[in-house]
Amino acid sequence: MAEKILENKDPKLEAMTVDHEVSAPKPIPVDEPTLTRVARPLRHVRHIPVKSLVFHSKHGPITFSYENKIKLPISKNKLVVQVNYVGLNPVDMKIRNGYTKPIYGEAGIGREYSGVITHVGDNLTNRWNVGDDVYGIYYHPKLAIGALQSSLLIDPRVDPILMRPKNTLSPEKAAGSLFCLGTALNLLAQLKEKDQLNTESNVLINGGTSSVGMFAIQLLKRYYKVSKKLVVVTSGNGAAVLSEHFPDLKDEIIFINYLSCRGKSSKPLRRMLDTGKVVDYDDFNTLKETEDYTQGKFNVVLDFIGGYDILSHSSSLIHAKGAYITTVGDYVGNYKKDVFDSWDNPSANARKMFGSMLWSYDYSHFYFDPNIKIIPKKNDWIHECGKLLNEGVVDCVVDKVYSWKNFKEAFSYMATQRAQGKLIMKVEGF
């Protein structure tokens, strides 16, 4: 059949073309190509980037570094805190002074902070939560790490840390409280344990506007209830500063202006004991006022400035079986030269060993290491500090707050040793 059809071909049909009226297909719409940013899946993020303020030696500059990272997931016994504020302390400059050559790599700055928890280890979820406002101490002076970082990896078994009460303690004050308050609290507790401090103690404070000095004044009057007036050696405007911040205590303090006696504070102190009168001079050595003094020699001398002037006249100033405790040593503190953990001079070492026998009083150089593993468990100083701050028994006096971009200005001011209160650095988010 097919063969017959093929044999009967029609040439006209073969030459014909047929046009079909069919419309073209409708074009497919295509959106304009755009690029959009999407969040990286968390499973791909293996670390937390960290911005730090570091140095390499005391001769080199302080700079920002991006080398440090916090590995994820974190250890089950640790926390990550996003740092908002950091308190500066003289020990920061003393540690830097110990790095004479840039052979140790980067070294961090800052020993105390306030911030917000961003990561919680598995074993700590019953105590801490993401979003908790906290403050604490990050004290590792021999490990070349500091708190001036955008994020910190915290081990609560070593690093003191507390919840910050938002209504009673600002983040700025929280960042500058624990190191100096802890120093003052432990120093006075040591005197109390030795029966060298009680409500009838006559106390002399050398360096009343230092941060430790301010906390010591508050603790002596409000916590230890010392009834006698405190004799406080301070700078020309120190009396005004202390009176402004602690109006309830200004009548409980006898101020000695060391500038009016060319830094030899022992001279007006001895005159005060000899005459029974408190003579106050202004910066032009003009007599301002006189009041009676009947408290006698001192049971306790707290030195936060250093120097040998008061010690050289200790027999006429300090009671037998009294106590002289310093946080600096025989030499007047010099933030530009002093080195952390350096040896005391021979005379100071001799006083520590034989002071009670040769000079009839107890001499000690107090060092505060807030590492929780070092301090006995019965000494719950960190929570006691938190309670004192929360209840308003003590207050942190903040002198100035700097952005950490202005770190040069902050460290220059601290080097003058004229700060009257804490210097706080504001850490920007990263």
Swiss-Prot record:
InterPro entries: ADH-like_N, GroES-like_sf, Lipid_raft_assoc_Zn_ADH, NAD(P)-bd_dom_sf, PKS_ER
A single GO cellular-component term on record: cytoplasm
Example of a GO MF term: oxidoreductase activity
GO biological process, one term: protein targeting to membrane
Task of the protein: Lipid raft-associated protein involved in the targeting of PMA1 from Golgi to the plasma membrane. May induce clustering of PMA1, which facilitates partition of PMA1 into lipid rafts after leaving the ER its and transport to the cell surface.
More about this protein: Present with 937 molecules/cell in log phase SD medium.
The name this protein goes by in its record: Protein AST2
Taxonomic lineage: Eukaryota, Fungi, Dikarya, Ascomycota, Saccharomycotina
